[in-house]
Amino acid sequence: MFKRKKYNRAILALNEFIERYPAIPSTPYAYYLRGVITEEKSASILDEIISDSAQRDVQSVHDAYSYFYLLIDKFPNSKYSEEASKKLVVLKNILARHEFYVALYYTTNGSHIAAINRSKYIIENYPNSLSVADGLHLMAQNYDAINAEELAQDARTVLYASYPNYSPNYKIDR
C-alpha cells in the first residue's frame, strides 16, 4: 500500500497491527513505518507546487513527529529509535520554519503583535531549530514597527550574541 501511495490505508493497517500486537518484535518497525509513511505523505502532496515543506499545511508533519516520538518513548532501545530521533530533528525544523512563515505573513500584513508572539513561540518551543535566528530578527523588526525600541534592542542583543555572523535569509514583501 505504501509503495502504491495509498498512505491512509497503510497507516490504518499499521494502526490495527500495533493495536493487535503491541509488544511483538516487529512492532517497533510498525511504529517506524507509520512515521515514515506519514512523513512521505506530508512531502508528496504538494511537492510540485511548493518545494519548501514548511510553507504547506503541517498537520502530517505533526502526525509524523508524534509517531516517531511514540516509537522512541515505547521502544527506546529499538534499532529504529536512533533513526526516528534524527527524523524528529528534521521535523522540528520544518515545524519551526512553518511558524516563521506565519510570523512573516503577519509582519507583511502589519499584524506586528501577532508576529512577535509567533517569533516568541519559535524561540520557546523550538530553541535548537534553524529558525530561531530568523525569529529573533523578525521579532526585532516588529518591535521596531510598534516603537518598542528597548525590546527591539534586546532581541538584537540576543540574536547577535547567539549568532554573531547572522544575516537574514528571508525577504519581507510589503
Region locations from a protein language model:
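Acidic, polar-rich low-complexity tracts and alpha-helical solenoid repeat scaffolds
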Residues: M1-R174
